[in-house]
Amino acid sequence: MKAKLHVLFLCGWYPSEVLPTNGDFIMRHAKAVNLKHQVSVLHIISKPGISKTTIEIEKNLNFNVYIAYIKPSINPFTKLFRFWSAYQSLLKQIGVFDVVHLNKLYPFGLFALHLKRTKKIPFIISEHWTGYHLTDKKKLSWIEVFLSKKIAKKASAICPVSNDLKNSMLKNKLTGNYQIVPNVVDTTLFKSINETSKTFTITHISSLLEPHKNISGMLRVAKQLENQLDSFVWNFIGGNGHQFKALIKSLNFKKGQINFIEHVEHEKIPAYLNASDIFVLFSNYENLPCVILESFSCGTPVISTNVGGI
């Protein structure tokens, strides 16, 4: 193997103008790989309001990002053609590379399969998607299952972030060479600074999606905490919380201060974790959340439901 490889990160999820935080954990993984190897990121996403495909390229020494924005379409064949054309255009810009690092097996795995068959370039898969768990199995279409099996079979390695995710993928008959590779943490950013808060502070950080993250369950727990604590603050970071206003009103908090903070830049998250007495995750299903590892790195204790890869 070459001492230094040129790795193509083929990403169905990646931060962009359309979704600035989508797949930010993949970006951090790519930057971790870039510590040892050259990395090029390829991402394609539909962007409302444009009339034709546009390409944006960001080059920074050995870490280059290539994003194509395509005109949206409800016609699946038109959408497929636009994605394929954008993919071909980006490949020309990127040039020669040694290996493909596919993030999320489907649908971008079809591109990885194409590169293996036409250019003999091997690929590995990093998988993060909770959709493989049995609770979400109904969301997988037959064509996705069929093609995913083909992609998984041809991968040199399949790297789920937890053993639990591996088991869920195997239950979906996605066989292959499995190697568990957890999510990454920037320990130069997430570190303990021994900051304390006068008021007992609890923090939760997520997408705040109710079926997944169980925000309503945490709010009910917060109400019960009023029987134990004279005062406390519970920060929910990741959304405005509008959908929980009725529940919060009905719970009628007297001692607890509930804050919903819509967006916090990743670089500022350590300050919230360091100012917290505890981090809480109440999910109904999970893989291996980055934020738990980041909390540990800051020295902040974690309370979590015992689900998935946690």
Language model features by range: what are they?
Residues 1-56:
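N-terminal subdomain of nucleotide-sugar transferases
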Residues 152, 263-264, 271-276:
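Short alpha-helical donor nucleotide-sugar binding micro-motif in glycosyltransferases
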Residues 28-31, 141-158:
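Membrane-proximal helix-turn-helix segments that form the acceptor-binding/catalytic region
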Residues 284:
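Aromatic "clamp/platform" in nucleotide-sugar-dependent glycosyltransferases that forms part
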